[in-house]
Amino acid sequence: MPRKHTYLNVYQTGKLTVVSFVSAEHLDQIIVSECRAEIAELIKQHACEVLAFDLTGVKLVPSGMLGMLASLGRLGVQVLVYNPSDEIREVLEITRLDSLLQVQHVEV
């Protein structure tokens, strides 16, 4: 039976794993350490090499969550960010996180 994820919707698994956040409008309520543990388990379980976060509809990403996304490279995966809002894209550029997190627009 597939594992129920607390924080993530998992759309695709394998070398490219695509996820979104269960509660896209309430990312500020996520416990970052628990979310990171869930992501680490997902990476290991599916031998993930590229992890893509679909941010479609997300309006705000708390700084702790941005730090967590940036730190995922230490787990040996490339991190992609799909469809960030203009505001989130601007924050990624200002903080230079766009050099660690590859930003892409994809059709959903």
Which residue ranges define each predicted feature?
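Amphipathic alpha-helical interaction surfaces in cytosolic regulatory modules
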Residues: 25-101
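STAS-typified acidic loop motif
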Residues: 2-37
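Short acidic-hydrophobic, aromatic-tinged amphipathic segments that line or gate anion-handling sites
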Residues: 100-108
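Residues that form or immediately flank small-molecule/cofactor binding pockets and catalytic motifs
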Residues: 15, 86, 108
